[in-house]
Curated annotation (Swiss-Prot):
This is Ribonuclease Y. It comes from the Bacteria. The gene is rny. The lineage of its organism: Bacteria, Bacillati, Bacillota, Bacilli, Lactobacillales. Coiled coil: none annotated. One of its GO terms (molecular function) is RNA endonuclease activity. It is a single-pass membrane protein. Residues 221-281 form the KH domain. HAMAP family: RNase_Y (MF_00335). Its EC number is 3.1.-.-. Belongs to the RNase Y family. Keywords: Cell membrane, Endonuclease, Hydrolase, Membrane, Nuclease, RNA-binding, Transmembrane, Transmembrane helix.
Amino acid sequence: MDIISIVLLVLLVVLVVAFIFYAQNIKKNKQDAESLFNEAENKANEVMASAKREAESLKREAEAFKKEARYTLREEEQKQRREIEDEFKQERQELKETEKRLKQREEILDRKDDTLTKKEENLDSKEENLVRKTDTLSKREEQLAHIEEKKRLELERISNLSMDDAREIILSETRDGLTKEMAQTIRQSEEKAQAEADKRAKNIISLAIQRVSSDSVAEQTVSVVNLPDDGMKGRIIGREGRNIRTFEALTGIDVIIDDTPEAVVLSGFDPIRREIARMTLEQLVQDGRIHPARIEELVEKNRKALDHKMREYGEQAAFEVGAHNLHPDLMKIMGRLHFRTSYGQNVLDHSVEVAHIAGNLAGEMGENEALAKRSGFLHDIGKALDHEVEGSHVEIGTELARKYKENPIVINTIASHHGDTEPLSNIAVLVAAADALSAARPGARRESIENYIKRLKDLEAISTSFDGVETAFALQAGREIRVMVKPDKLTDDQIVILARDVKNRIEDEMDYPGNIKVTVIRETRAIDYAK
């Protein structure tokens, strides 16, 4: 074999090997392409599936958002509808109240129109009477002139009197006759005017009173506190009676525990003390912690709470009578009258009633109705402080009105409503009349309880008049007086002498049935705080 053949053979082998390698390479590339295609197809399927899931999720979220938006829109629509309905109801209620006020105003105007019509009719009647009387007098004058002429001629003929003498005689006789007739006419007119004035006054008072609706409730000197069970009575009494003794000493109120089921009675003449005791006992029963320290804490807390409540009572009463721009201190002082009685009549209710009656009287008389109501409302304000400040309630009330710069008419009304000072205005007279009407109406007052309360107050006043006495409480319906002294002012030996002195003063200055027990208490406390 020659070289060419060998070369050709080698070339052939190379070609065959290259072809085989090329074929394998093509096959491998095809497999790689198929693998890449399958992988791309799988990824595309995954992307499509993910996109489909995302689309379904977005669709569900859109549906949920749509439902939520529809629900929110429905809620908002219902809320707006309710607000509109409430606003409509409120406006309709306001419209009804306005119509009611207009109707009341119209009724007042109708009554005033009727009154004016009656006055006009009375004036017309009086005018007609005057015209008739004038005509009668004219005729009488003509008759007298004719008679006078006849007399003159007769006298001249008979007595040969001169003209001047005859004229004097005739005038004298005529004057006497006219004087008698005039006196009779004046007397009849005065009697008629007096009858008309009495009738008019009764009519005005009737109109003023019938427009005031008042309660006839007598004040009591006891309060009842309900208990959850009878076992609570023992806890109120405490070990060896220490709880009930502390309670009575701090409040000055008798605690009556008897066989009445599930109830305790608080007895005391001072309504403020009794209210503090009632509030304290109810809170103790509700809380369940009943011991001297807790009792002392609640008594002090309720004293402050009652001060706030008294201001609310004063503001409510002032709003009811229309007494605007009252000084806040005056409102608080007026609120104290809610817990003050006069012959069993609540003084704050009495003041409101006097304000309404005085306002109605002023309206009928053409006076300032608002000023009359304000004067009537404040006329007894001194009674709120008459047991704390020296002087009568009239003097105290006058000084308070001056202090807070009230209208001079209001000041004079307070000073004159019991006749101590001359009234300087019609309003002062009207308030005095309204005060008498309110006190005199049936069921308004009860004198026996007032005398009883005065005796208890006198007991306390005598006891607190001695040096070193801190406070005193009349208990057991006035059969016992407990005197609390300052331990740094009096010794144990001195309180024995004080008890005897109080007893002697009571015997000398008071009239009372039975015996009165005088108890003087001296208590020393040492307080410190562990830190």
